[in-house]
């Protein structure tokens, strides 16, 4: 969300933003037809990665993705992989050895997309902004440590799920424990970032810095993952979910 509309310091900062960062509440207050198009078409410069909800959207009408939104949707990828890990644990506890390839592929995505890319963005750009301002330093210290611990657990999952790895009962038990530990750590980790760390960026960054960070994130995403970027990773996760029979969202609806 670009601006909440609430009387907070964060909103004061974002009101200085150029027209490209029009807030969602502001958009809702504008007429859905002519006035809305005029407001969006006023965007200038090179905005961060646009949202592509409508196929007929012109470049002038595209709504930019902010840095916190970018990081939060990447957390969505992580959440889906944690669900894959949960399904893997369920199957391992039922003496099912079949999920090993899917778990290995999931751990590879965590390594390349979450740890080597997403986590590095946080450590290089997000945490320093807060630490330099003397804000949330106790939290960023813990988050950095958890990033390191996560890499250790991912190393173990990758090693345990290779084709050459022994997959006897003790190995399966250890794998399930490592995945459970990863889930237990990163669920509160990403929740704290989404609700405390990322919102605090508005208190310590100018509108220009906020926009520049979003552009930096977009450039790095495409450099590492190609033009499709984030969507290509989402598609890979969806394929893994389908292979495990957990892609259909309706199956999670209680009766």
UniProtKB/Swiss-Prot annotation:
Gene3D superfamilies for the chain: nmb1532 protein domain like
Organism in which the protein naturally occurs: Mycobacterium bovis (strain ATCC BAA-935 / AF2122/97)
Residue spans crossing the bilayer: none
Recorded GO CC terms: plasma membrane
Region (Disordered): 42-67
Pfam families: Hemerythrin (PF01814)
Name used for this protein in its record: Uncharacterized protein Mb2018
Matching InterPro entries: Hemerythrin-like
CDD domains in alphabetical order: Hr-like (cd12108)
């Amino acid at each position: 969300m670009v601006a909440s509309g609430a009387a907070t310091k964060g909103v004061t900062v974002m009101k200085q933003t150029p027209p490209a960062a029009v807030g969602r509440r502001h958009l809702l207050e504008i007429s859905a037809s002519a006035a809305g198009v005029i407001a969006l078409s006023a965007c200038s410069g090179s905005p961060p990665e646009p949202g592509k909800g409508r196929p007929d959207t012109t470049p002038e009408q595209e709504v930019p993705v902010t840095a916190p939104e970018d990081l939060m949707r990447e957390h969505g990828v992580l959440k889906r992989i944690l669900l894959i890990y949960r399904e893997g644990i369920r199957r391992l506890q039922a003496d099912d050895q079949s999920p090993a390839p899917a778990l290995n592929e999931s751990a590879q995505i965590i390594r390349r997309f979450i740890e080597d890319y997403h986590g590095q963005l946080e450590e290089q750009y997000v945490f320093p902004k807060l630490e330099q301002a003397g804000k949330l330093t106790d939290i960023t210290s813990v988050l950095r440590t958890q990033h390191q611990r996560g890499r250790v657990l991912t190393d173990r999952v990758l090693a345990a799920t290779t084709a050459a790895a022994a997959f006897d009962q003790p190995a399966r038990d250890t794998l399930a424990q490592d995945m459970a530990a990863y889930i237990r750590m990163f669920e509160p980790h990403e929740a704290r970032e989404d609700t405390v760390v990322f919102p605090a960026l508005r208190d310590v960054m100018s509108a220009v810095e906020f926009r520049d960070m979003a552009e930096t994130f977009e450039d790095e995403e495409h450099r590492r993952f190609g033009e499709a970027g984030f969507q290509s990773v989402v598609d890979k996760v969806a394929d893994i979910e389908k292979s495990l029979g957990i892609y259909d969202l309706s199956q999670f609806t209680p009766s």
